[in-house]
């Protein structure tokens, strides 16, 4: 798999906002899945904001969710 395919697969999982799809992607690549539901979604939404080509409607949803749950918008 080349990097373009990897990024496409990653974005499809994250941008879907379907927990099962995101978890399947994480398991495939041995990425830690937080047990805490809010921490899981905070990571997804922070990822969406960190990716420059994220769809604008997802960026807005991410901002609203993070702000509404008391999380910073940045990953650091």
Q: Which residues are covered by each model-predicted region?
A:
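Long, non-catalytic architectural segments outside compact domain cores
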Residues: 1-46, 50-67, 71-76
């Amino acid at each position: 798999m080349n990097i373009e395919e990897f990024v496409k697969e990653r974005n499809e999982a994250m941008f879907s906002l379907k927990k099962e799809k995101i978890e399947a992607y994480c398991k495939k690549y041995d990425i830690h899945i937080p047990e805490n539901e809010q921490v899981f979604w905070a990571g997804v939404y922070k990822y969406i904001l960190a990716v420059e080509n994220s769809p604008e409607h997802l960026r807005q949803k991410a901002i609203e969710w993070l702000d509404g749950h008391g999380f910073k918008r940045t990953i650091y």
